[in-house]
């Protein structure tokens, strides 16, 4: 079981809320979130209720301001624990929607998709094993998209507004 603390102000000040399970709407517990302490577990945070909006992946540690978790603002409205995965990682990406066009399989992290293959956009993806994180920019920067095993027929299925993915990596658990 995981535990995460949300604070309204920077440097772990102001009103706080302790959470130890998935929560689809945090808005009744705090108005804004400017710092976070993850005591245990790995968490995916969302800017909007019902697990929507910008996503942020956090693990055990202290985040004294929202820029430390690559946040764009002080809005965190839902959270869920990342399920633990043991074993292989496997994902197939496609240059077009509905798994059309050129396909490539990956078992390892990719810090720069532009250097790795000829197409710059990922329009669909099938995650076979493990949990993965897509990033809009190379070197694991920019907006984050958390992917669990399953089919993603178009980029909007993983919450993106465009098909641009600059890097991706396997989600490893840190406790």
From Swiss-Prot:
Question: Which residues does the annotated region (Connecting peptide) include?
Answer: 84-88
User: Is Flavoprotein found in the keyword set?
Assistant: no
Task: Provide the alphabetized UniProt keywords.
Answer: Eye lens protein, Repeat
Mind telling me which SMART domains this protein's record contains? XTALbg
InterPro entries, per database record: Beta/Gamma-Crystallin (IPR050252), Beta/gamma_crystallin (IPR001064), G_crystallin-like (IPR011024)
Which Pfam families does the UniProt record give?
Crystall (PF00030)
- Give the signal peptide as a residue range, or say none if absent: none
What PROSITE patterns does the database record attribute to this sequence?
A: CRYSTALLIN_BETA_GAMMA
* MF terms (GO), sorted A to Z: structural constituent of eye lens
Q: Per the UniProt entry, what are the Gene Ontology biological process annotations, in alphabetical order?
A: lens development in camera-type eye; visual perception
Q: Which residues form the Beta/gamma crystallin 'Greek key' domain?
A: 2-40, 41-83, 89-129, 130-172
Q: How does it assemble?
A: Monomer.
Domain-level remarks: Has a two-domain beta-structure, folded into four very similar Greek key motifs.
Q: Which family does the entry's similarity section mention?
A: Belongs to the beta/gamma-crystallin family.
What does the UniProt record say this protein does? Crystallins are the dominant structural components of the vertebrate eye lens.
Name of protein: Gamma-crystallin-3
Q: Which species is the source of this protein?
A: Xenopus laevis
């Amino acid at each position: 079981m995981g535990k995460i603390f949300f604070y309204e102000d920077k440097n772990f000040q102001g009103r706080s809320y302790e959470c130890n399970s998935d929560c689809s709407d945090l808005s009744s517990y705090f108005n804004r979130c400017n710092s976070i302490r993850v005591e245990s577990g790995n968490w995916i945070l969302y800017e909007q209720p019902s697990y929507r909006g910008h996503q942020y992946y956090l693990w055990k540690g202290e985040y004294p301001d929202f820029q430390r978790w690559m946040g764009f603002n002080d809005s965190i409205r839902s959270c869920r624990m990342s399920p633990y995965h043991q074993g292989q990682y496997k994902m197939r990406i496609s240059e077009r929607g509905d798994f059309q066009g050129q396909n490539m399989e990956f078992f390892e992290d990719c810090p720069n998709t532009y250097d790795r293959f000829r197409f710059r956009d990922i329009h669909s993806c099938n995650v076979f094993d493990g949990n993965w994180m897509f990033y809009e920019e190379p070197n694991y920067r920019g907006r984050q998209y958390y992917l669990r095993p399953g089919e993603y027929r178009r980029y909007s299925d993983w919450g993106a507004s465009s098909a641009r993915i600059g890097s991706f990596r396997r989600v490893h658990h840190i406790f």
